[in-house]
Amino acid sequence: KEPGFSVSIALVAKDGTPNIGVVFDPITDTLYHAAKGIGAFKNNNPWKIKPANEHLTYVTDRKLKDTPHAAEIESLLHQQVKKLGLKGITEMAGGGSVLNGIRVLENGPACMLKLPKKEDGGGSLWDFAATACIFQELGLPATNFAGRRLDLNRKDGTFMNQEGVFYAN
């Protein structure tokens, strides 16, 4: 058991819509799940998200300073801080894409983003399918970098690098 590790499973429709998403954090023994049209749950209780921080939490797998295009990302984050009237940015680095999606939900206002890139990587569709369903049921964005629905049933591969990823709370 390593912090940031999780187990997830999802059911995705042929059109790429996430219909069921389940995430388990073995470190905290916490279960998150959602089903399309039914809602989102944390440890089997209906889950309501209430962003309470005075800062924007940037959730990432590696520190911003070690990220390609760090200046571009930092600029985007500062724009959001200003737009939302927040006091600054707090970085939460480490962990896999699945739990980082959950961290966005639990540390709002928060975001996780992966810029589009040409080379493979940036997580695979199975890294995002379960949390995309949970976000969908909470009415929060889990989109590609252009703001469109994630393509979770790609025919040309599993990596999400071509469209990027954006999660927000």
Mark where each language-model region is:
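DPxDG-like acidic metal-binding loop motif
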Residues: K1-F41
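Short hydrophobic/aromatic-rich beta-strand segments that constitute the beta-sheet cores
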Residues: A40-N43, T60
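Short, flexible active-site-adjacent loop segments at beta-strand->alpha-helix junctions, enriched
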Residues: G37-I38, P46, L64
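Residue-level detection of beta-strand-connecting loop/turn positions
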Residues: N43-N44, G147
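An extended, acidic
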Residues: K50-N169
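Short acidic, gly/pro-rich beta-turn/loop elements at beta-sheet edges
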Residues: Y32, N44, P68-A70
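Short capping micro-motif at the N-terminus of alpha-helices
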Residues: G21, A34, I49-K50, L152
